[in-house]
Amino acid sequence: MTLNSLPIFLVLISGIFCQYDYGPADDYGYDPFGPSTAVCAPECNCPLSYPTAMYCDNLKLKTIPIVPSGIKYLYLRNNMIESIEENTFDNVTDLQWLILDHNHLENSKIKGRVFSKLKNLKKLHINYNNLTEAVGPLPKTLDDLQLSHNKITKVNPGALEGLVNLTVIHLQNNQLKADSISGAFKGLNSLLYLDLSFNQLTKLPTGLPHSLLMLYFDNNQISNIPDEYFQGFKTLQYLRLSHNKLTDSGIPGNVFNITSLVELDLSFNQLKSIPTVSENLENFYLQVNKINKFPLSSFCKVVGPLTYSKITHLRLDGNNLTRADLPQEMYNCLRVAAEISLE
């Protein structure tokens, strides 16, 4: 990974654990309940130390208040907002962040091109609402789209078209099936993070961009993986497929032998054997399967001074293995392992 890509990578990593933690005190170091600027909606707060942010959280609002020009960061979390009129943001062309989590928004009540007119918008978060499909059209400046915890059943082809700067998409906890999103992410060549966990996928969608670093399919109903599905993913580092219905017969021999992969989670499936992985893999989670054998060939093709597995954490607890099942030469292959959990 280049130094230029490191900052965005660190942001993505932090987002795994703090997806919705963008509180004002943490972000900007001020008290959000202090004095407000004169140019602010009366029911909201625009802190003196950060006057381009307007906080309207937890106010039981049913409509979006008038937003003064000059506001760049707008927070409307935990309200009762049901609709957005097309002219709502006409006065705030500089808006960069629009956070609408925990409201009552529906697609039919988001009017016209209300979002696409925001030519500087970078973050759009509409988590925990009542959406049934992805919102759109959206501005090409967008880099972070979060639509998790809705009732989304489809992402229409073209809904995300032209979003060349989009790096993060959260679609977890919806009602998506593979056919309803196949091809929806085509052309998103900057996409690094895609979360499709907790949906209704029975197979993997087609047409995902090969730029991805992090790809999450956990908590679905996936039973098999097409041969060479991940072949084009040259930079994929984190892959989660836990809590699915994967069996040995549904996993082609080398499908997880991805040289860029750092972490692979296959826990809580129905595997009886350990799939072959790259020697570059560092974290491998296989707990709560039906594994009953430990072939070193799954980790090391050849063992030598410079050829060994880089795995540091290996979880095998909740399987049909004991310490006695581990081959004596295991540590020649797994020589840098700091943790091997069996029970």
Curated annotation (Swiss-Prot):
Molecular-function annotations in GO? collagen binding
Q: Where in the cell is it found?
A: Secreted, Extracellular space, Extracellular matrix
Question: Disulfide bonds, which pairs?
Answer: C300-C333
Q: Which SUPFAM superfamilies match?
A: L domain-like
Looking at the record, the residues that make up the LRRNT domain are 31-69
Keyword terms: Disulfide bond, Extracellular matrix, Glycoprotein, Leucine-rich repeat, Proteoglycan, Pyrrolidone carboxylic acid, Repeat, Secreted, Signal, Sulfation
Query: Sulfotyrosine (modified residue): where?
Result: Y20, Y22
LRR repeats at which positions?
A: 70-91, 94-117, 120-140, 141-162, 165-186, 190-211, 212-232, 235-255, 260-281, 282-301, 310-330
**Pyrrolidone carboxylic acid: which positions carry it?**
Q19
Origin superkingdom: Eukaryota
InterPro entries with a match to the protein in the record? Leu-rich_rpt (IPR001611), Leu-rich_rpt_typical-subtyp (IPR003591), LRR_dom_sf (IPR032675), LRRNT (IPR000372), SLRP (IPR050333)
Key word Glycosyltransferase present in the record?
A: no
According to the UniProt record, one GO cellular component term is: extracellular space
Q: What post-translational modification information does the record give?
A: Contains keratan sulfate.
Q: Which GO terms describe its biological process?
A: positive regulation of transcription by RNA polymerase II; positive regulation of transforming growth factor beta1 production
Glycosylation: which residues? N91, N130, N165, N257, N320
This protein's record includes keyword Repeat: yes
Signal peptide bounds: 1-18
Q: By its UniProt entry, which PROSITE patterns does this protein fall under?
A: LRR
- UniProt family annotation: Belongs to the small leucine-rich proteoglycan (SLRP) family. SLRP class II subfamily.
Quaternary structure and partners: Binds to laminin.
Q: What is this protein called?
A: Lumican
